[in-house]
Amino acid sequence: MTILSDVKALGQQIWLDNLSRSLVQSGELAQMLKQGVCGVTSNPAIFQKAFAGDALYADEIAALKQQNLSPKQRYETMAVADVRAACDVCLAEHESTGGKTGFVSLEVSPELSKDAQGTVEEARRLYAAIGCKNAMIKVPATDAGIDALETLVSDGISVNLTLLFSRAQTLKAYAAYARGIAKRLAAGQSVAHIQVVASFFISRVDGALDTTLPDHLKGKIAIALAKAAYQDWAQYFGSPEFAALETKGANRVQLLWASTGVKNPAYPDTLYVDSLIGAHTVNTVPDATLKAFIDHGTAKATLTEGVEEAQAQLAETAALGIDVETLATRLQEDGLKQFEEAFEKLLAPLA
């Protein structure tokens, strides 16, 4: 038993926020699963770093450049292969839990963030190309992305809805998921295999606020927001309306805590793992945070602790004139821009 097994027993999955060919082929990912890691997430920045720093890509990049393909097609060829290989490593985990865990995420192109139909078409294409039941397509939680979520769920595709900072936008996503499930059920199709995670970003909130907050609130608001979002989640998925879908096989969306590596060196390096452990959630962590948590983290159900204090902290933040919903919109736009820039940087050497 490891601390990751203890966290899993508390109802939370720990995923790795990293993917590369070396990680899979060296057996390191398989070893992480033995320790208790339950899934993998990727994004354009992760692939950009992998392609630039992992020698195992060099020959394939050279060969792909000899083919009449666009830079994006060359990227997708390698990314799809990596995700498929990671899905294979995670398949035993996936099957051992009846399809509840063991997912690997691949993101649609960042330039589609405001294009619902384009997102749906690319998500369908990528999902088919990977060809694994434990693949999850990552879609940004813009209004267009939430529209796409509804369609993809009705298609039977598992989705990682990413770049959430807003409680209101997260609730919109739950409603879109429920509509997608209802459509699929109305068509007489199974929904039991569909898993959706709502990726709520943590450290970027504190990074944006800590320069403007009084000392006693610094490093507190992201966790407070997550705890409030979890209360929203419990209310939504505990409702009679969702219970009616659940009796027909629908799974609850799971909140996934993302951006949980600590950016401020003044904070404990496991702050955003220790503080956010709760049932029906996922935490995707970078390698360094995973190692730190295994070494000196604490497995305790903390997500439902101090909820009143969290609400008071959010109220105090609002009283200071800080609107966290306005901040959420800005942080999502910043995140989209960062992924677009990473994608451009990723494609440049593939031209």
UniProtKB/Swiss-Prot annotation:
Pathway the protein contributes to: Carbohydrate degradation; pentose phosphate pathway; D-glyceraldehyde 3-phosphate and beta-D-fructose 6-phosphate from D-ribose 5-phosphate and D-xylulose 5-phosphate (non-oxidative stage): step 2/3
Catalytic activity entry: D-sedoheptulose 7-phosphate + D-glyceraldehyde 3-phosphate = D-erythrose 4-phosphate + beta-D-fructose 6-phosphate
Principal location listed in the UniProt entry: cytoplasm
Enzymatic class: transferase
GO terms assigned for molecular function: transaldolase activity
Key words of the record: Cytoplasm, Pentose shunt, Schiff base, Transferase
Keyword Transit peptide among record annotations: no
Top-level taxon of the source organism: Bacteria
A Pfam family this chain is assigned to: TAL_FSA
Signal peptide: none
SUPFAM superfamilies the record matches: Aldolase
The enzyme's E.C. designation: 2.2.1.2
Family annotation (PROSITE patterns): TRANSALDOLASE_1 (PS01054), TRANSALDOLASE_2 (PS00958)
InterPro entries: Aldolase_TIM (IPR013785), TAL/FSA (IPR001585), Transaldolase_2 (IPR004732), Transaldolase_AS (IPR018225)
GO CC annotation, single: cytoplasm
Assigned protein family: Belongs to the transaldolase family. Type 2 subfamily.
NCBIfam families xref list: PRK03343.1 (NF002881), tal_mycobact (TIGR00876)
Protein purpose: Transaldolase is important for the balance of metabolites in the pentose-phosphate pathway.
Protein known as: Transaldolase
Organism for this UniProt entry: Neisseria meningitidis serogroup B (strain ATCC BAA-335 / MC58)
Classification of source organism: Bacteria, Pseudomonadati, Pseudomonadota, Betaproteobacteria, Neisseriales
